[in-house]
Structure formats: structure tokens, C-alpha cells
């Protein structure tokens, strides 16, 4: 078969008409320098602040410095094989992490990838790590409690849902223990928890995860990990990633609790990044925006009103408020709370729990110093019974501290002073609590009632612990319905007062401690 020239030219014209060129524009640049996880890129003309930049080897960097002729970015992951001259591309996306109920019970890294060997995540979607905090109109006042299970905290420094309460103290004073016990105490409360470990040893984090699992609290907890061996960029971003995971529950009308352990290490990681990016250093060599580093993170912890939740869920959830409660941890050096980062975080948060080395070494654990620990908004969230019974405890301890200092110089003391000193010592002993042994509202209320109404007056100081243990065993055995009623209602009236008095009178008669 022969084709003439006309047919050939027609076929060629048809093929040309059908030919479709799909052009794909890439904003591409070249690495001009690599140093300690920070790369400088030339040629990225349309790069956003915080944008993900695609690197060779399925890795990403985040653009932090946008300069006239170059972009400074931090690499998320290993950077030893990156070299000058390598091509990189803008992605047009801000960093996002997986969020949803499928993350509960899982251990993930800063980027949301599972590291617990339990298979892939079943996430509900993705959320940007950087988000704007809810506005003033979208918030609701804090009036519901978060029970930590610690007598000294729930009585004197109460925490409310949507509050930011700082845990501050030197190393080895029980900061992490307090936060982990608060998470364990939420296993039956319906509050979802997020634990963010920043710059810690992998063995320490493994121990925390094991303890959460042993006490049945891992099932409603997400653990976000950026170990000490990971890059400064991942340590800097870990709290924001954890916050995005917690906001998923807040925005859907649920309650969540997030622990940042600890923000001192995040500030150090951010200082390292900033100095490598050649940003001008300020006080203690921190960059000028280190206050904003923590304020934009902690302002995202809030209680949002029902209108906000309804608008966010497009009407699916109605009449429910959501909350994200934050427990940031700060490590001080030799008890110096006037250093740069501690003062910043104290001014941002709604109160602080100050843990003291001297108290810890004296066996008073949790080592809470009630004198300078404060909760600025939690009082409104306390249950009625705790509010009624805790006032006397704080006063007794304040008077005891004052008299204890004075009595060191006075040889002879009158009976009233001796009684106050004795009462203060017994209350201090009563507030001691073992780790991983959180107490219910009813148990705390009963113990505080015993202290306030003078039932400890004839109990020896050395037997306060056994008195408490025997009392709790007695009520669990013989008065469980009353304990259940107090736990559910949190109310306080003459009837409940009479019942508590009756329980203590009958228990004291047994002399079983």
C-alpha cells in the first residue's frame, strides 16, 4: 500500500493537533552552603516563611530566613550527605502533621511518623503545626477542673480546663513525675492527653511510655518524641506538632491536656538554629523573638465556646465547649526563676507550680512550695467541696512556715504556738504522696476534712501516713456509695459534712492504724 504526500501531510497535521504539552513550573534553587543542619539556598524567588522545601532523598527543610538573594532553611532529619550545588524545590506547603483519634495510644516523632512499631497510623487528616490561637470572642472562662490526683496541687494550686499552668523547678525535683501522674489520673475522665518529650534520652521516654501503659493511660494519650539525638529543628518543632494534635480534640468540643517536657530544651534548640542562621543574639544569647516562640505556642491552649465549636464542625457538634489545657515544664538552674526563659514563661502562663530541691531532699514529695506556687484562674474551676476544705490548709501551712522560721530563735513557746507548729507539721506530712498513686476527689476531700477538723491532733507525726492509708481502706470498704456520690457531684452541704464527720468518728474509734 502506497501513501501519497497529501495523506502523509494530513496524518502529520492530525498528530500535531492532538499533541498536548503539560508544562509544570517548579520554583527551583541551589544549595550554596551547608553547616550544622542549616542550609543556604540561592534562586528560590517565591518562597514563603515556614514553607517546606523538598530536598534530595525524600527529605524536607523549613524556610526560616528570607533574605534579598538567599533563603536560610533548617533541615528536618539527617544532613551529612547534603552538598553545595544540589537542587531543591519549593513545595508551596506549610508543615503539616497527622491528627485524629487514630493517634491515641501511639508514639510518633515530630513529623507524625509512628516510631513504636505498631504499624501505620489511622489518622483523620492533617493539620498545620503553626496555627493562630482562638480570639478573645471565641473563648470561654475557665470553670471546670482538671484533677491531677495530687492533694497539694488540687487543694492549693487548682488547675482548670483551658488553663496554662507552669511546672518549674531544678533538675530531679519531680517535674515529669507530677505531669505523668496528671496524665494517669485522666484515664477515666474523658480528657485526651498529649505528652511532648523534647531533648530527652530515648531510655527515659521509653520508661515513661511503659509506665503510662502499665497504668492504663496510654490508650488515651499521644506521645510526641524529639530525642536529644535528633536535630535542633525537630526539637524546636515538636511542641507545635503536639499542640496541633491536641487542638484536633479542642476544636471538636472535647477536652485535652498537653504536657511540654520541657520548654527550656526547646528554647536552647531555637537559640542554636537562630545563631546558625546568623540572627542577632540578645540576652543569654537567645534571639529577640524567644518570648514569641513560647507565647504563640501557649496561647493556643484555651477553652473555646460552643459557637466556635459549632462553626468549626459546620454544625455537627452543638452546645459543647472544647478545651486544651497546657502544662509546660521549665528547668531552672540552682533555683533561679529570674533567668530569661523562666520569667518569660511565668509571665505567659496562668500560674506556676514551683518544685524545690530542698523540699524534695527532705522527703516532702511532691516538693511543691506553696508560698510561691499560684494558680491565677483555677480557683473558679475547683469543685465546691475542695474549695470549702482547701482554704484552711493553705492558711495552716502559711502560718506554720512563718512560725517555724521564728521558733528557731525562740526557746520557750506558748501552747497555742506549739499547737500551730504541730498542726503545720502534720498537714505537711499529710500532703506527701507516692508517685503513680493519684487520689480521687472524694479521697482527697476526706483527708483534708480530717486535717481541717482537728482529727490529726492526737495522731503521732510518724503515723500520719498509716492513718491516711487505713482511713482510705476503711471508707472504700464500708462507705463506697458516699465516695461515689462526692466524686460525681463534687458538692458540699450539711448532710455531706455530717456523713464525713460520722465516718471519721467511727474510724477514730477503731484505732486501726
UniProtKB/Swiss-Prot annotation:
Could you say which EC number(s) this protein's record lists? 7.1.2.2
The record's section on PROSITE patterns has: ATPASE_ALPHA_BETA
Question: GO CC terms on record?
Answer: plasma membrane; proton-transporting ATP synthase complex
Note the coiled coil stretches, chain numbering: none
CDD domains xref list: ATP-synt_F1_alpha_C, ATP-synt_F1_alpha_N, F1-ATPase_alpha_CD
EC supergroup of this enzyme = translocase
Q: Where is this site: Required for activity?
A: 373
Record key words, sorted = ATP synthesis, ATP-binding, Cell inner membrane, Cell membrane, CF(1), Hydrogen ion transport, Ion transport, Membrane, Nucleotide-binding, Translocase, Transport
Is Ion transport one of the keywords UniProt gives this record? yes
State whether keyword Membrane applies. yes
The UniProt record gives the binding positions of ATP as 169-176
- Give membrane topology per the record: Peripheral membrane protein
Q: How does it assemble?
A: F-type ATPases have 2 components, CF(1) - the catalytic core - and CF(0) - the membrane proton channel. CF(1) has five subunits: alpha(3), beta(3), gamma(1), delta(1), epsilon(1). CF(0) has three main subunits: a(1), b(2) and c(9-12). The alpha and beta chains form an alternating ring which encloses part of the gamma chain. CF(1) is attached to CF(0) by a central stalk formed by the gamma and epsilon chains, while a peripheral stalk is formed by the delta and b chains.
Function of the molecule: Produces ATP from ADP in the presence of a proton gradient across the membrane. The alpha chain is a regulatory subunit.
Protein name, entry field: ATP synthase subunit alpha
